[in-house]
Each structure stands twice: as C-alpha cells, then as structure tokens.
C-alpha cells in the first residue's frame, strides 16, 4: 500500500529545490543510503515491528528483575506491593511466542510471497505532512480501540472468551503488553498496520507510526510512573497510571492512550480517587462480580 505515495513528476531543477528545502531530507537520505535492499523488502515492516517489541521487553525485563530495588525505580513503581518475577515474565513470553508463530511469521511469509518491494521515494515527506498524518493516525487508533476495548469488557461472553486473557495480570509490566488472545492481537495488529492506508503515506511516516504506536502501548504497561512521564505534562494523556488502574479495576480507564472519552463517560479514575471512597464503594468500584470472573485464570 505504500506504493500509493504520489510520484512527484518534477523537473531536475524542481527536484533539487525540493530536496534542498525539505527539513527531513538529510535524515531520509542518510536512512536510505546503502540500506535500500533492506528497507524496501516486504519483510522489513514485520521484523522492524518485532524489534521494537523485543527492545521494550528486554529493557524493562532487566529493570524489573535486576533493578527493581534501586531507589529511582522503587519509588516510581505504581503497585509497590507487586513484584515482577521471572516466572511471571516467562508466562507472557510463552504466549507471545505462540502468537508470533500463529500470526506474525505466517503473515511475514505471505508478504514475502505476494507483496512487492516498497518503492522508496526520492523525497522525504514534509514536516507538516508527517506530523499531521501521525496525529490523525494516533487519534483514529485511540478512538477506535476505546470502543473495541469497551465492548470487550461490556459484552461478558466476549470478555471471557477474548480480553480476559490480557487481564490475567492485575499488575501490568512491559512483557504483559502483548499477553493477548490471538483474536485481539489480530485486530490490534491489523488496525495499526492498515490505518496509514487512509492516506498516501510516505514509508518514513509509516515506520515512525509503527514506533510510536508500539512504544506508547508498551509505555502504558510498564508499571512505573516516572517523573518525566507525559501524563504529568499533558492532562489528556493517560499514561501508565491510568492503564495500571484499568488492570487493577478493569471497568475503569478504557481509553488506551488519551483519557477524554473516559472523562466524558465517567470511567476515568486515579489512585487518589480510590482513597477518597467509602469502604463499601472501594470494595466494588470498577470490579467484576465474583460470578462474572468465575473460572477465569489470574496470574497476579
């Protein structure tokens, strides 16, 4: 689909002018130089995406297992009474491995066979083009996934069959971000992959979108509230504390990245709000009944 990026029918002089005036052109030329055969391969997008996954998991697994008692990380831990152990991490990695064998690698093979090489444009995208498209992709995914997520919680048979797999963990950590039922992985992966198809999207914009979408999805699962976290700057951004709350109280904080829909619909709640509740309300707020969760597997 990236071949839909418009071909610029420019004269030599016009092309040189555009190359000299586009802010991202030096970076685009540097990225392409000598790497064309890799970047144009239909295998590049899936393995690029996997490399982002593996990096987040590797970094925060090291932090969770070996640095959890370092004061900086200990203070930033949201659910301080929950320790991330190697046994917990292995359970998530095992499911991720099966999901990759079921979906990721077969889809990579399909792309290798049927998808032509990506045509790498000569020109970089303009800054406005890239930023405006990334903003639209971000808003579109956040809005759409909110409703997918909301329905998965409100339709009980769907929750029990599909989304409860992700909620085996009430205290998330980076490796649990991809602890998903295959159906949910397919939906989320397909939407992240195809949403840029609504525009003629430059492949550089496409790759940056992949990085942002996956990184934000991991960031909200890390289980740490760092002093530099984005939610401390932008009130409309959920961040790790909101999604941590969602895992602890699964009928709250449905929106994945922003929080405006949760605020409008009364689902946004903080740990400070919990402390203000009466004991009776605290015991039930945002939780399923014991009957609703009967028979579901809980890992932590």
Curated annotation (Swiss-Prot):
UniProt-annotated glycosylation sites, renumbered to this chain: 9
Membrane topology: Multi-pass membrane protein
Primary location: membrane
GO cellular component: endoplasmic reticulum membrane
E.C. no: 1.14.99.-
GO molecular function: C-4 methylsterol oxidase activity; iron ion binding
Essential cofactor(s): Fe cation
Domain Fatty acid hydroxylase per the UniProt entry, residue ranges: 135-266
Intervals of motif Histidine box-1: 148-152
Any one Pfam family match given in the protein's UniProt record, by short name: FA_hydroxylase
Superkingdom classification of source: Eukaryota
UniProt xrefs under InterPro entries: Fatty_acid_hydroxylase, Sterol_Desaturase_Related
Motif segment (Histidine box-2): 163-167
Keywords: Glycoprotein, Iron, Lipid biosynthesis, Lipid metabolism, Membrane, Metal-binding, Oxidoreductase, Steroid biosynthesis, Steroid metabolism, Sterol biosynthesis, Sterol metabolism, Transmembrane, Transmembrane helix
GO annotation terms (biological process): sterol biosynthetic process
Subcellular location(s) per record: Membrane
Annotated TM spans: 54-73, 95-115, 130-152, 192-212
Motif placement: Histidine box-3: 242-248
Function in brief: Probable sterol desaturase.
Family indicated by similarity: Belongs to the sterol desaturase family.
Protein name: Cholesterol 25-hydroxylase-like protein
Organism per entry: Caenorhabditis elegans
